[in-house]
């Protein structure tokens, strides 16, 4: 490419929230690519505007068609924080892309309430399985949730009540960084009457009690905690087995003849970013897993 692709992070304060230098890059562009919401934030521009389709990977490949042009891609906040940046850099090297970030939603939210980013775990539910969050719900944990849509806060409140984490605190951030920014702080056990914006993020302060339900993050969980028909690796053997397997971040486990799934279930609790494939032919045992 003759010029680098400019990958520009834009906040909820839109074009006006960008520096003059970044504004001039956008105004000078010949091709501007982004979501409809981001494109609508721009003033009149001479560039051809292209909105993402449902097939992002194909759209990114097509960028090559404009390689002789000055290209800007608009993304939310920090494009490398659960954004389009990762996917773009799978197809183009960093020598072909200049990343110009704005503050991430996490940075803005932590700044509003004075929390240290390093003390917080991040979970994205955007286009992912909602149940992915369950493994993060632990006593004294702080979790930042990138919501899927306006229903996410209510679903999280329902889940926390079900898991008996009803004393936990929530911060619900809507339209963070924009004119319509709002921050709602509430206890999980308080009534929910709010209608939330699609653009929301949530910070959970997990507060447990003696009745709280959560996945232990240690090995040797009691056998009675697993549904089984007697085909189960006993607690003490399970603890030794898993320690010998030495699970690490991004490890892959194949469990052949899963039985109750106890080995795999415990393995998954040690690190959150692991992959497990279980092979089990007994239909009844599949239901246990």
Regions found by a protein language model. Name each.
Residues 2, 68, 140, 250, ...:
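Phosphate-coordination loops involved in phosphoryl transfer and adenosine-cofactor binding
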Residues 260-272:
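Conserved SAM-binding loop of SAM-dependent methyltransferases across substrates and taxa
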Residues 2-7, 20-23, 69-71, 142-230:
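A contiguous loop/helix-start segment that scaffolds small-molecule binding in enzyme catalytic cores
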Residues 250-259:
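Conserved class I S-adenosyl-L-methionine
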Residues 105, 110-141, 148:
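Short, glycine-/small-residue-rich phosphate/pyrophosphate-handling segment
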Residues 285-287:
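Short alpha-helix immediately C-terminal to the canonical SAM-binding loop
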Residues 1-100, 107, 130, 276, ...:
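Class I S-adenosyl-L-methionine
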Residues 232-249:
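Conserved alpha-helix/loop element of class I SAM-dependent methyltransferases that forms part
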